[in-house]
Design a protein with these regions (language model features):
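Aromatic-lined ligand-binding clefts that engage carbohydrates, nucleic acids, or primary amines
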Residues: 21-76, 205-208, 218-219
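A generic alpha-helix propensity feature with a strong bias for hydrophobic helices
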Residues: 7-8, 87
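Domain-level detector of nuclease and nuclease-like folds
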Residues: 67-250
Length: 250
C-alpha cells in the first residue's frame, strides 16, 4: 500500500534538486514573453490588479483600473519581472563594466542590460525564468521600476480600485498576492545565489507575507504549467501545493 506522506516527501526532495538548477531551457527573454502569454491563456489576468486582458490589451473595467498618467501604456500588456532584472543584473560584471564585444556600429562601447544579455548565458537564463515573469499593465510595469516591495504609509489610491501603492521607492501590492511575490523571491534567491536578490530585512518581510497569504489553486496551477515548460520546480510553491493536494503533476 502506498504511503502518501512518503510520496510527498520524495517529490519535495526531487523538486528541491531540480529547482537548484534553475532555468536551463529558455534562453531568450523574447521566447519567455511568448510563453508567459501562453501560460496565461484566454482568461488572462494581470498580477498586481487582477485585470482581465486579451490580445495584449487590458480590460480596465474588469478591475476598476484608472490610469495615473500614461494612458497609452496603461492599455497594453507588458511582461513584468517580479524580481527586477536590474536588481540581479547589477551582479554581473558585463552589466556594470561592459565587455570587449559590447560595441555598437559606431564603435562606442555599451554596458547594462543589453551587454549582459549579449555576453552572459547565466544572465539570459535568469532574465527568462518564467517563475519570475507575469503579464502586467504597462503603466504599472513602468511605475514599479526596480523599487523594492514593502509597506507604504500613504493611503492614496492612484490607480482607481487597484490596490497598488508606491511611495518613496517602495511598492505595496494587494494582500492577495503578497505570498506569491514572497515565494518568487525565495525561489530566485535560492536558485541563483550570490546575486544579491534577498537581504535579511526583506526576507523577514517576505516570511510574514508567505504565512499570511498561502498558496491557492491558481498559483499552484501556474507553477505546474511552468515546471512542464521550463523543466525545474519552484519548491517554495510546489511543496505547499502538494501538501494541499493542489499541484497537478504528470
Amino acid at each position: 500500500m502506498r504511503n502518501p506522506p512518503l510520496i510527498v516527501a520524495a517529490l519535495v526532495i526531487l523538486a528541491a534538486t531540480l529547482s537548484a538548477a534553475g532555468n536551463q531551457r529558455i534562453r531568450s527573454f523574447n521566447k519567455a514573453k511568448r510563453l508567459v502569454m501562453q501560460i496565461a491563456g484566454d482568461d488572462g489576468r494581470t498580477l498586481y490588479c487582477n485585470c482581465r486582458f486579451s490580445d495584449k490589451e487590458v480590460d480596465h473595467d474588469s478591475c476598476g483600473y484608472v490610469p495615473r498618467r500614461d494612458t497609452r501604456r496603461a492599455r497594453r500588456i507588458e511582461i513584468e519581472h517580479v524580481v527586477p532584472a536590474e536588481n540581479f543584473g547589477r551582479s554581473f560584471i558585463e552589466w556594470r563594466e561592459g565587455h570587449a564585444t559590447c560595441v555598437n556600429k559606431e564603435g562606442k562601447p555599451f554596458k547594462g542590460r543589453r551587454c549582459a544579455g549579449k555576453t552572459n548565458e547565466t544572465y539570459r537564463l535568469m532574465e527568462a525564468d518564467l517563475y519570475n515573469l507575469f503579464p502586467e499593465i504597462g503603466e504599472l510595469n513602468g511605475d514599479r521600476s526596480n523599487y523594492r516591495f514593502g509597506h507604504v504609509q500613504s493611503t492614496d489610491m492612484e490607480y482607481g480600485e487597484c490596490q497598488f501603492k508606491i511611495d518613496e521607492r517602495v511598492v505595496e501590492p494587494r494582500s492577495e498576492i503578497r505570498g506569491d511575490i514572497a515565494r518568487i523571491y525565495f525561489y530566485m534567491d535560492a536558485t541563483y545565489p550570490e546575486r544579491g536578490i534577498l537581504g535579511n530585512k526583506s526576507r523577514k518581510l517576505f516570511e510574514a507575507w508567505d504565512k499570511a497569504d498561502p498558496v491557492d489553486a491558481a498559483e499552484c496551477e501556474r507553477a505546474s504549467k511552468i515546471e512542464k515548460l521550463q523543466g525545474n520546480a519552484n519548491d517554495f510553491v510546489k511543496r505547499p501545493c502538494l501538501e494541499a493536494g493542489l499541484y497537478i503533476a504528470d
